Amino acid sequence: MFSPSPQTLSILVAVFILATLLIRRALLPKPIPGIVYREANAKKILGNAWELLQWKKKHGEMFGYLANLAVELNEPVFQIFVHPLGKPWVIVADNREAFDILSRRTPKEFDRSRFLRSLFMPLVPEFHFHMPTGERWKAHRKLVADTMSPAFLGGVAGPQMWKSTMKLIDLWRVKERLAKGRPFSVSTDIRKAAFEIIWAATFGFDSGSTNAQTELLETLPEFTNLGDMDHEVHFPVAPDPPVFKAGLALNDAMNIGVQSLVPGLHLWLAYNLMPSLRAARSLKEAVIQDEIKKAINKFSNQTDLNWEDQGNLKRHMKSAVDIVIAREIDSARKEGRTPELMSRTVQDELFSFMLAGNEIFTLTAWTLKFLTTHQNVQKKVRDELREQCSAAVERGDAPTVSEIMSARLPYFEAMIEESTRCGSVTQTNIRTTMQEVNILGHMVPKHTEILMLNNGPGSFMPPLTVDEEKRSESSKGTAGKIGQWNVKGMRDFDPERWLVKDEEGRLTFNPNAGPRHSFGAGPRACFGRKWAALEVKIMMALIVWHFNLEPTPKPLSSFKPFPGVAHRPEMIYLRLSNV
């Protein structure tokens, strides 16, 4: 039996200790020279990751940690360490420089984030959103470009949004009657309505989710023993159609990646190994393929499409599937090639509309909470709507899509923008450096993730001091073009901060009153922002038109966010009364 000598044992122990120290050193963060960081985090293998997770556990989101760290370090550009062996992330806490990066320095110096790519690739590998800027991205975006045209939004998507929202109104009328003035949660209702609206506009038919819930509640007798007026009312839930349920499940799975240190791998394993998600993906693909086939049959022999004639398009186009398939057939005919109609590209681009439901649901949820809390704002919004849609008032009916879209509603627009701001719908914009870049005098290496805060200094905290000489030339040229918020009241919900008077003395919505990057900016801004803006406008206009959003009890009025893909409120309760 081998028995090492004391000298050998000493050598082995020394080698083990040395190896341990070398491994630990290799795992420690490697700061980018010249960029500020918290020194204590650079001495930990997990860097800032543990503190980020603890902040998220306590507050429901993690970007507040970065905003506070910016103030602590007193630096508009600093770095954090989130992945062992990974590169540091660079944080930009200056709105003007962030806007310059998004709008003028993308895509030459900055491009779509690799982190975001890892979130979307496992489910929709051919979705243009996560692709680097280039010919492939342009081709994919061109395929769906018509879905954001005024003709499609006003003539096809808008009416579908209106119809679906009215079904939500019908559901809430039943709930309001059964609740008898008591509060109830609308989180699930809003989420399903947001997705159902997108579903109807994308595929041209109703999923039936909201109708099923309304029909179930209409069969119930009047509720008894409801408790006091502040007691929450619970309602039974109708089962969702299988394909609608599948779409929601696939969307929810994105949260797996958001909360993972290796999002791409974690999501790939989930989509491919979890039986429920595998079944959901198969059902989703089968339904999309079936709808594509219907559109192919509809347009294969259609030769009179005039893309400049809006009336012509309205006659033929009933959904996003229609317009995407018709465009591909028409383009292929002109280019002398075979159309790629059943491709993964077409399927992923169509399903991507469903992924946008997170942001729409989130913005609608925050808006409802702010209007419930700020009764004076709610009254101003309703009064403006009724004044500008006076024909609907005279008819005793809801305003039509065209009336809502054409109405001059500066206060309404300001309220939506302020809800977007105060709800921090998108707390950060992320880009990847495409070359070594200079950000406020700091040299940042190629392929570094850049996080630009929407919730920090200059937005909800006093701006940090920046040496103007260190700004990029394009940033210097924008001085004074976008306003800055008064430090006093930065955190307050105040739609009037977005309003100015025009030459005729009329109140006008000023989009440049202050920083607004929630949907990004520049060539890689959110592709679906026009769709989202219209959907939220129609939903909120019809909700406020039909209901008073009465104050809710304090225990049901928390503004704490829910951790996930989008920064949404954890609870959404309404106490409704008919207008």
PLM regions and their residue ranges:
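Cytochrome P450 catalytic-domain helical core, especially the substrate-recognition surface
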Residues: Y37-E61, A67, L116-T202, L220-N297, ...
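Central I-helix of cytochrome P450 enzymes
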Residues: A194, I198, I288, D330-E384, ...
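N-terminal membrane-proximal hinge/A-helix region immediately C-terminal to the signal-anchor transmembrane segment
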Residues: F2-P125, E135, A139, W162-K167, ...
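Cytochrome P450 I-helix active-site segment
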Residues: E308-G311, T372-V425, L440, P445-T448
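Conserved cytochrome P450 K-helix/beta-meander segment immediately N-terminal to the heme-binding cysteine loop
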Residues: M452-R506
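Cytochrome P450 heme-binding "Cys pocket" and the immediately downstream C-terminal segment
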Residues: Q375-Q378, A521-A525, R529-H567
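Conserved cytochrome P450 catalytic core segment spanning the I/J/K helices
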Residues: A280-L363, K501-E504
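Hydrophobic, well-ordered secondary-structure elements that form the walls
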Residues: V381, S419, V444, F493, ...
